[in-house]
Structure formats: structure tokens, C-alpha cells
A protein has these predicted regions:
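Cytosolic, long alpha-helical scaffolding segments
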Residues: 1-209
Length: 209
């Protein structure tokens, strides 16, 4: 019998908290996608993302407080200690780039913004499903598959960033070049943070095979 099969009910709270965080992450990604589809609602979406970011910070604090108090945990303490901030970092990165879109006064969207957002939503979905699978760890190879998919999405974002920056330098407006280059790089950074979550998920799943 594995340790996961011996967990007391109260120790399942870590999975409940991780579920809340991945739900918030997925919602934040959805708001970002909505923003890049229609920037007229950008400020409302920024506010919604900021609220989710605050909630995620609170969940992260709760996880670490409970970790300090728990004698038995469903995962290794260091695994919980890696996963919680990794998830929080993704939401922080989404919050940052969403506020860049607002603060830089970007009034018109484009296909590149939308494609980045689509990749982020897809990563958020894989993260939510992958973290959900940790609740039993009966299918560690499925968790690994999620991490592989996340990595593939990140690789696509790196290619998108390269082509997007090349296209940027075809414009004659230096201010727009600076603004969009910064935004594109930070959108790719969101996906890099997602990829880090994927690495953590992979490490956890392989440890429990």
C-alpha cells in the first residue's frame, strides 16, 4: 500500500487548495484571452485578474502554513513546497502582462497577442488536469504526458516570439516596437513559467511511479 492510500481526510486539503489555485490560474488565462480578443474591456479584465492574483497569494500562504503544521502530507513536503510557488508565479506573470496591455495604452489587438493567449489557455488547461491527477497519483505517466504537452506549447511560444519580433522591426514606429516587444516577451515568460510547472509535475510523477 502506498502513502497516498493512507492519507487522512484532513490531509486532502492540499489537493483542494491546489485545485483552487489551478482554477484561478485557468480563469486568469481566460480573462487574458478575452482581453486580447477585445481590448475595450481590458481594464475590467485586468481588475478580475488582479483579484485572482490576490486569491492565489492567499492560497499559497495557506499551503505553506498548513505544511508547517502537518505531520503527514499527501506528497513530499518539498514537492508541495515547489508546486505551490510555481503555480503562483504563473498567475503573477499573467497579472503583470495584463497590466502592461492596459498601462501601455494598447488599443488594437492582433493575431500574435491572440495566439500567445491561446497557448497560455491551453497550458492552463494542461496544468489544471495534471495537478488534478496528483490527487491519486495512480496515473503518473498521464501526469508526465501533461508536462510534455506543456513543454511543446512553450516551444511553440518561443518560435512565435522570434517571428513576432522580426515582424515588429518592419514597423516605422519605435515606440510601438518597444511596447510590443516588451509585451510579447512577457507573454512568452508566462509560458516559460507554465513550463516550469510542467517540470515540477514531471518530477513529482516520476518520483511516485
Amino acid at each position: 500500500m502506498r502513502i497516498q492510500d493512507l492519507i487522512l481526510p484532513e490531509d486532502r486539503v492540499f489537493f483542494q487548495l491546489f485545485s483552487k489555485m489551478t482554477t484561478s490560474l485557468h480563469q486568469a488565462a481566460g480573462h487574458l484571452a478575452d482581453m486580447t480578443s477585445d481590448l475595450t474591456s481590458a481594464h475590467q479584465k485586468c481588475h478580475a485578474i488582479r483579484q485572482l492574483e490576490h486569491e492565489a497569494d492567499g492560497i499559497t500562504r495557506d499551503i505553506f502554513e498548513r505544511l508547517d503544521e502537518s505531520l503527514i502530507t499527501p506528497l513530499e513536503p518539498e514537492e508541495i513546497g515547489r508546486l505551490a510557488p510555481a503555480l503562483d508565479d504563473v498567475i503573477d506573470a499573467i497579472d503583470w502582462v495584463s497590466h502592461q496591455l492596459c498601462n501601455y495604452g494598447i488599443n488594437e489587438t492582433n493575431e500574435i497577442l491572440q495566439e500567445f493567449s491561446s497557448l497560455i489557455v491551453k497550458c492552463a488547461q494542461q496544468i489544471e488536469e495534471g495537478v488534478g491527477l496528483l490527487a491519486t497519483l495512480k496515473k503518473p505517466l498521464e501526469v508526465k504526458e501533461k508536462s510534455i504537452e506543456i513543454n511543446q506549447l512553450w516551444n511553440r511560444s518561443r518560435e512565435l516570439l522570434s517571428s513576432a519580433i522580426l515582424d515588429l522591426f518592419k514597423t516605422q514606429d519605435p515606440v510601438l516596437i518597444i511596447k510590443f516587444k516588451d509585451i510579447y516577451e512577457n507573454l512568452e515568460e508566462v509560458l516559460a513559467k507554465c513550463n516550469h510547472v510542467g517540470h515540477v509535475l514531471n518530477d513529482i510523477s516520476m518520483h511516485h511511479v
